[in-house]
């Protein structure tokens, strides 16, 4: 049975329809403004990388041109072959050194931070919160603050052994962040899950590796990415400790493209593009897990 509309309900209905129509008109406009703003932000952050790539394919004359042109007169793709045989910088060995140090420091951090984060998350020992606060405070220290002490401690390490020193240093400086973020993920897993595994006969280590670690995999990936990138970009400790050019990582070796009499900016930017390719590949492979780790880690 339908209820007839009264004389007073018709204006109300018309007003409601007018309001809905106005909202529908405003929604596309607001969405367009949001998309434009997001696009401008993306362009703002991508512009340095675009400029770096464009400079990497310029000729020496284009780089030295005054006033400079943003676009090259011709694409000098041969720069990507020339840098591998440039006499002042051994890009291949420097790239190998960077990879060895970054991978070694990341594995070291995982080996130490995983059980430490699990213990902090699962056991309420005296001084737990001060310990976490102290761990977080160590993030304020940088290798430049301890440059003199690091040099005195590791200056006698010669040859490729100096890579081990850089692995230890970078591992130590990234350990606190890994413990902090991984303990948050371990804390998000209910204790009842571990208790059930212990009741089924698993030991504590078996429970951590077989039960807890698969559940906090996004957090582990997040820690791995941050530690790897921080080590890949590290400059201060490598600059202080590594004196031989053939052992220097890319961050220390690249400035040698800018010599006293010749400044090969195009080769330096070419090497910069080569240096970020491994990081881009890693992001492409683990993008979904990284985003999942960054989002799920904020919810218990």
Locations of the language-model features?
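A structural signal for multi-pass alpha-helical bundles of membrane permease subunits
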Residues: 31-300
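Short, Lys/Arg-rich, polar N-terminal cytosolic tail immediately upstream
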Residues: 1-27
